Every structure is written in structure tokens, then in C-alpha cells.
Amino acid sequence: MTSSIVNKFPITREGFESMQVELEKLKEEKPSIIQAISDARDQGDLSENAEYHAARERLGFIEGRIIEVESKLSHAEVIEVKSLSGDTVMFGATVTVSMLNDDNSEVEYIYKIVSGYEADASKQLISTDSPLGSALIGKKVGEYVEVIVPNGEKLYKIVKVEFK
């Protein structure tokens, strides 16, 4: 008898719902791509039919992405961030940090610590596995973390930890 251990990964409610929306959109798009392939096939010679090849490529991408998103959703463990509390940085925390700029002026940044599946630096969502995210995990308000970045090292001070 063999047993398989399924690795669950944490994800925020927002991240889970975003993945569900993506899956729904992909499944809605698939029939129109199948129809485009059929229409292109009806045009005759497929060897020089760019529409056919583009539609087949798009269908392959969509089918692969559907499988990937379904797999992620089946292995996701939704963490209700609002039910967490404390002053220690952990998954789901919204962390305010400050650092000194090159001109010695202090600047604050706000990041939410999330899984790699929902990380998006442009939205200040950083992964627990990123250099800054992993440095912050387990630290408390008032503590400092040093992070190696391409142009050297940056020192961050944890100003606030929230769960919202």
C-alpha cells in the first residue's frame, strides 16, 4: 500500500479567489479557440494557415494553464489572514518597513507577505521565499533585517505588522 503525501501551500483568500477567476476565464475562452481551429481547418491547406497554427498554440497554452491552475487550487490551503494577530511577521502579514535612501532620507514601504503563487512586486505582494520576505519572517516590530540586493545591502526596520 502506497500513500502519497500532498504538499499543501498557504494562500490568502484573495489569492485563491483570483486563481478561481482565472480558471473560469480560461474555461470560458477554450470553446471559442476550438471553434477558431475548426474554422481555420475548413479553409483548407493547414501547412500555411497561420490562423490555424496560432489557434492551436493558444489552445495548448490554455489547456496547460487550466491544468496548472486546477492543480494549484487543489493543493492550496486558504489562510484567513484577518483571523491572525500579533506583532511577528508571518505569512499573510502586511508589514510596514522603513529604510534609508542613498541621500540618508527615510522612506517607508508596505508589503504583504504571500505565497510565491500570488506574489506580485508591482502590487507590493512579496513571497515568503523572496530575499526580503524570507528575511522578515519571524521578526517583530522594531527589529532590523539586512537584505542583499543587486547593488549591495539594504537595511530595513520593521515599523508595523498588521493582519488585514
Report each predicted region and the residues it spans.
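Non-DNA-binding regulatory cores of transcription-related proteins
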Residues: 79-156, 162-164
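Conserved NTP-handling cores and scaffolds of large molecular machines
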Residues: 27-30, 44, 73-77, 140
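Preference for short coil/turn "hinge" residues that link or interrupt alpha-helices
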Residues: 4, 39, 71-72, 119, ...
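Structured, basic alpha/beta domains of bacterial-type, RNA-associated proteins
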Residues: 65-72, 76-83
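Helix-rich terminal scaffold detector
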Residues: 1-67
